[in-house]
């Protein structure tokens, strides 16, 4: 067995665990930004899981433009730690939004730029997945409410609202969510590769 026999599973575990926590922190930032229902049970879980490190960071990092800057800094720090650990495991290349990012070949400054790309990719993905969930729910069980649906509606509202103003429902069908998914996918394709290219210099 080669050295990769244990390295690849370990890298997978590290990436999964780090990404899950980054997702929670970024979700907290987005939900605060959108003034989501704090008493929602999912919101409560996210708050409980992310409060301890944010409490520490907020002592040094003030809010900017009314937003929780500490949450963004925490995300970047965790992503950076993830990349450093993957470098230690001798993982030369990872994929960020399906774009190869040679984390083993760039400077630590380049890694920081990759962190921004990874965070931007996750940010877009959250809105994209929320739109997909909304489409699926509208087909399977429209009209039913649960805590997850409440948060999904909160996340998708600022994207769907301007589209719905310009594209009203036609024949009883609302195509705004499909348009939003298309825009988000194209946006991801256009935004992430240049950031990764910048970090690769």
Model-derived features: positions:
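Selective transmembrane helix interface/packing segments
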Residues: 2-201
């Amino acid at each position: 067995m080669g050295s990769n026999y244990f390295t690849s599973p370990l890298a997978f575990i590290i990436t999964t665990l780090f990404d899950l926590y980054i997702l929670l922190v970024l979700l907290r930032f987005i939900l605060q930004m959108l003034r989501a229902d704090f008493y929602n049970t999912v919101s409560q879980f996210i708050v409980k899981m992310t409060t301890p490190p944010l409490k520490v960071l907020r002592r040094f990092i003030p809010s900017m433009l009314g937003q929780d800057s500490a949450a963004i800094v925490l995300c970047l720090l965790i992503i950076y730690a993830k990349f450093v650990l993957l470098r230690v495991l001798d993982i030369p290349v990872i994929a960020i939004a399906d774009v190869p990012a040679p984390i083993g070949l760039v400077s630590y400054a380049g890694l920081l730029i990759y962190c921004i790309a990874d965070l931007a990719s996750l940010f877009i993905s959250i809105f994209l997945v929320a739109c997909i969930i909304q489409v699926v729910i509208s087909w399977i069980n429209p009209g039913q409410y649960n805590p997850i649906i409440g948060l999904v509606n909160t996340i998708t509202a600022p994207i769907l609202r301007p589209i719905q103003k310009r594209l009203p429902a036609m024949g009883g069908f609302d195509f705004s969510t499909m348009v939003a998914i298309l825009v988000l996918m194209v946006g991801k394709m256009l935004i992430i590769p240049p950031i990764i290219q910048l970090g690769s210099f």
